[in-house]
């Protein structure tokens, strides 16, 4: 998966940077939002808690998707501005502790 940043715009009113990107994935299926988020965090040298992938739209018949990501200045700004659904789809899944199965003999 390769991500190209198309446009990067500062939005001082909302304390964030908006990034329009193109994601190419020629040998695999459409990546998940979390995969794209991790790649953008690495590219932008940002914190995982401050970046959200708002939308990602795959192109029909082409292994390419276009999307919008936002990097906030603080977690307070992110919580105040973003909708709960966007925050939920950008959260890491919780790891469930593995319980050992006991044999009932």
UniProtKB/Swiss-Prot annotation:
The keyword ATP-binding does not apply. GO terms for molecular function: structural constituent of ribosome. Residues 92-105 have a biased composition (Acidic residues). Keywords: Ribonucleoprotein, Ribosomal protein. It holds the Pfam family Ribosomal_S24e. GO terms for biological process: translation. GO terms for cellular component: ribonucleoprotein complex; ribosome. Residues 85-105 are annotated as: Disordered. The keyword Ribonucleoprotein applies. HAMAP family: Ribosomal_eS24. Belongs to the eukaryotic ribosomal protein eS24 family. This is Small ribosomal subunit protein eS24. It comes from Methanosphaera stadtmanae (strain ATCC 43021 / DSM 3091 / JCM 11832 / MCB-3). The lineage of its organism: Archaea, Methanobacteriati, Methanobacteriota, Methanomada group, Methanobacteria. The gene is rps24e.
């Amino acid at each position: 998966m390769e991500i190209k940043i198309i446009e990067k715009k500062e939005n001082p009113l909302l304390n964030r940077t908006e990034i329009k990107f193109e994601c190419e994935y020629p040998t695999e299926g459409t990546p998940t939002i979390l995969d794209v988020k991790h790649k953008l965090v690495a590219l932008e040298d940002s914190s995982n808690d401050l970046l959200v992938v708002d939308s990602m739209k795959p192109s029909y018949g082409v292994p390419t998707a276009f999307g919008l990501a936002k990097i906030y200045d603080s977690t307070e700004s992110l919580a105040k501005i973003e909708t709960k659904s966007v925050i939920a789809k950008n959260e890491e899944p919780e790891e469930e502790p593995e319980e050992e199965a006991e044999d009932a003999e």
